[in-house]
Amino acid sequence: MEHSSNRPEDFPLNVFSVTPYTPSTADIQVSDDDKAGATLLFSGIFLGLVGITFTVMGWIKYQGVSHFEWTQLLGPILLSVGVTFILIAVCKFKMLSCQLCSDNEERVPDSDQTSGGQSFVFTGINQPITFHGATVVQYIPPPYGSQEPLGMNATYLQPMMNPCGLIPPSGAAAAAPSPPQYYTIYPQDNAAFVESEGFSPFVGTGYDRPDSDADQLEGTELEEEDCVCFSPPPYEEIYALPR
């Protein structure tokens, strides 16, 4: 007979450890700083190139020309402003940082992520379950070969009985999970059934009931036969007295 309900061992349970990455406020601040630093860096480079160009135009090629005198003053000013922007982008926003500084910065977010905890996802059941920041112990079900088969022999389920209905002293009957059957306790070849064949027990429809006198008579006869069956043999039959 097959069991309709599945036991918990029948469901394979899988556990996956997932480390979610949640963007923090520091990451958002770093992205804004990168934009500002990149803007200052490219602005400083552009102003520096323009300042160098004006300086060269005013002091080398156009000497003695009054129309280009303003370039001699504007060129160094733009060059100084461009260099200032580049220094601010490098020093404050760390646009051109060294490899050692970048490694140290990468280690700090890693430590923040590990301290936040992990997430565990359970699959193999009706609905996946996720635990955040919890300590989970994985349960491995036993192999299917170690389980007892569903179909067992009837000899292991029914205890062995003698004709009188006595259970042997062995532990086979104690290990039987089911109660004994009626025909094993009182078989058809029992003396109680053989000798009482002359009587008519419960013949007819299943709804007819015998009289109370017949019930009492049959009950007393069965009790006497049971006593005879369960009573030990007399001592004289086992050990004959010497004459």
Swiss-Prot record:
Keywords of the record: Cell membrane, Endoplasmic reticulum, Membrane, Transmembrane, Transmembrane helix
Main location: endoplasmic reticulum
Inducers of expression: Up-regulated by low-phosphate diet.
Membrane-related topology note: Multi-pass membrane protein
Tissue: Kidney specific. Expressed in renal primary proximal tubule cells.
Gene inactivation effect: Tmem174-deficient mice show markedly increased serum levels of Pi, FGF23, and PTH, resulting in vascular calcification. In addition, deficient mice exhibit reduced SLC34A1 responsiveness to FGF23 and PTH administration.
Subcellular location: Endoplasmic reticulum membrane; Apical cell membrane
Transmembrane segments: 40-60, 73-93
GO biological process: phosphate ion homeostasis
GO CC terms of this entry: apical plasma membrane; endoplasmic reticulum membrane
Quaternary assembly: Interacts with SLC34A1; regulates SLC34A1 internalization by PTH and FGF23.
Free-text function comment from the UniProt entry: Regulator of plasma phosphate homeostasis. Decreases serum inorganic phosphate (Pi) uptake by regulating the sodium-phosphate cotransporter SLC34A1 trafficking by PTH and FGF23 in the kidney.
Name under which the protein is recorded: Transmembrane protein 174
Organism: Mus musculus
Gene: Tmem174
